[in-house]
Amino acid sequence: MARVRGRKLIKKLKKDEFHPEDNKTHDEPTVSHVNETAGGDNSDVSPNTFFGVLDSGELDYFKKAESTLAIDTFENPDEKYQFINSVIEESKGKELKLATSQISSKLMERIIMESDETQLKTIFKAFNGFYFNLACHKYSSHVLETLLVRGAAQVEKELLTPDFDSVDEGEFVTTESLFLFLTNELQPNLRFMVSHQYASHVLRILILVLSSKTLPSTVQNNSTLRSKKSKIARKMIDIKDNDNYNKIFKTPDSFKVVLRSMLSSIYTSFTHGIPQGSGHFSEISLADVMKFREICVDKIGSPVIQLVIQVEGIFDRDRSYWHLIFKDSDEKDPKEESFVEYLLSDAVGSHFLQNVIASTRIKYVERLYRLYMKDRIPKLAKRDTTAAFVLQSLLKVLNSKEVKEIMDELVPDLSVLLNSNMDFGTEIIDASIRHDNYLRDEIIEQLMKKYYPRESSDKNILESCLQLSSSTLGNTRDDWPTAEERRKSLFLEKLIDYDDCFLNSTIDSMLNLPAERLLQMPYHGVFSHVVEHVLQVKRVAIIKRKLLLNVLCKDIVNLSCNAYGSHIVDKLWTFTAKLAMYKERIATALCADSEKVKNSVYGRQVWKNWSLELFVRKRYDWKKIVKEQELEMFPDSKPLQPKTFKRPNNNNNSDVSPSFKKSKFQKK
């Protein structure tokens, strides 16, 4: 069929193209942002309200208080409680100044994390009426996030173990009701918070708390809670998460009601009052759909919409937010096609699509795959910074038939795809395992072709996968290892677990290294895990076990006293099974330098794991433990060298076995 040409067609295609606005502003709200019922006439207050600054004396006091809490040298919990109480008492009337100050906001976060129920409620009440202002501020937004997480833990505590004594004392306000005051105050400005640089983070935490989802860490690299800059800053100021993070808290039914109201409010703010539900989808204007799609690819608003799509199924069976973005028809839509193409080629858009398809119904994902991605899988796979991640997500969520279709397209070019995206290898291996080892042999062939080609004379999987020669191996600086080395190391460990050929290739590559170079690996924070991972006694041949042990035994004492190497020495306890000579050689070397080993915190653990006290004092009992280990690991094994009979004496000049020699009483 000839290609369709013409100016009208080009004009139509340009009209259907998705072009998000580049100069979007996130400065001022377009609606009243403080609920009048939250206290006072605050409807005309700007979200960037200035609450004043502390004088020099107050600033010095609060800086010293922050340092005291950071050092945490209190003799007992009661002393710490009294100190926090005195700081809270001193800060009365100055809470808003403290929260919006770059220096003293750290103090507020520490106090919130260390406070008890009464102190926490005091802070909630101090912020009442100004939650929206605090959410929109660079520093106080972090304080508010910490307050929400700590408050979630307190709500669960009140729910599971209600305290009736506080009612008798006149204190009857629960943390649940304080949360409801907060959400009521933020309700009129939820649309603005979605795309605000700081308030969006507060909104995400609030949605996670109300929906009883896991509250992620604020400092981990893979945390979805804060931006990269925020996580780095949090590490620099040395505020560690307490036990309230990386947990799911039970919440009352009122939280679900509030969350439903919040999601409905956000939805109607984007659709000009049209309510949720499949019966109203046709009433939404195209302009509103396009505006919402722009929020989906906005670097600030996109994470919020991802989270909303993740939790909307709790209340809305029609998935109104999903259908505000994507259609439900079986036919292609030009504008939707343009939008999906933008998602597949944009960094923010591909991240959005990757996450939402992992949290919605499979039939919606299948529709997008069938209409817009199925016919061009190889081309999309080459977009290694965008669409490639979407394909990896599809491999996880689609049904078996579609996954096999994708694998049929990707596996023949896997060795090439790995050049730019190592994660493809991991996802394809996992997909193969989930679907009865589909294309297993072809995958292994492609991986070997990439990392250990048979025809190459200088093949080395450590070099091809880990780039060992240009790595930080052997460096003594504090900034190693790198994140990239960690990724490569984890991938090689994945290959080792996948098939024995990768295990043997890794061991062969290690043995081809100079002994000094190989002995550097156990001291490396990342590559030591690779060495530890190959020490699998049941999968490695005896001869290769001996060759590895010959190298590792050269520096066994120093290894046992090292943070990383000690794990390898522990692993050698099982790796030397049925190799009693090597086991005794290691034990003897450690005992010969027992003072050095016992003076090291890591060495003491090795000493304990190897039962070296028994080796020194009761050698027979130690050998009994060794024998029991061998029988447990190899119950059906035979001795490595079968017992042989004594050879007959050659001086007899006879070819007959001694057992068959004639007796002197036998007849000749």
UniProtKB/Swiss-Prot annotation:
Biased segments, Basic residues type: 1-13
Gene Ontology CC entries for this record: 90S preribosome; nucleolus; preribosome, small subunit precursor
GO molecular function: RNA binding
Domain of life: Eukaryota
Disordered: annotated span: 1-42, 637-668
Entry keyword annotation includes rRNA processing: yes
Location relative to the cell: Nucleus, Nucleolus
GO process terms (BP): endonucleolytic cleavage in 5'-ETS of tricistronic rRNA transcript (SSU-rRNA, 5.8S rRNA, LSU-rRNA); endonucleolytic cleavage in ITS1 to separate SSU-rRNA from 5.8S rRNA and LSU-rRNA from tricistronic rRNA transcript (SSU-rRNA, 5.8S rRNA, LSU-rRNA); endonucleolytic cleavage to generate mature 5'-end of SSU-rRNA from (SSU-rRNA, 5.8S rRNA, LSU-rRNA); ribosomal small subunit export from nucleus
Keyword tags: Nucleus, Repeat, Ribosome biogenesis, rRNA processing
Cysteines joined through disulfide linkages: none
Predominant cellular place of this UniProt entry's protein: nucleus
UniProt xrefs under SUPFAM superfamilies: ARM repeat (SSF48371)
Compositionally biased residues, Basic and acidic residues: 14-30
Family, similarity comment: Belongs to the NOP9 family.
UniProt function note: RNA-binding nucleolar protein required for pre-rRNA processing. Involved in production of 18S rRNA and assembly of small ribosomal subunit.
Protein name per its UniProtKB record: Nucleolar protein 9
Species annotation: Kluyveromyces lactis (strain ATCC 8585 / CBS 2359 / DSM 70799 / NBRC 1267 / NRRL Y-1140 / WM37)
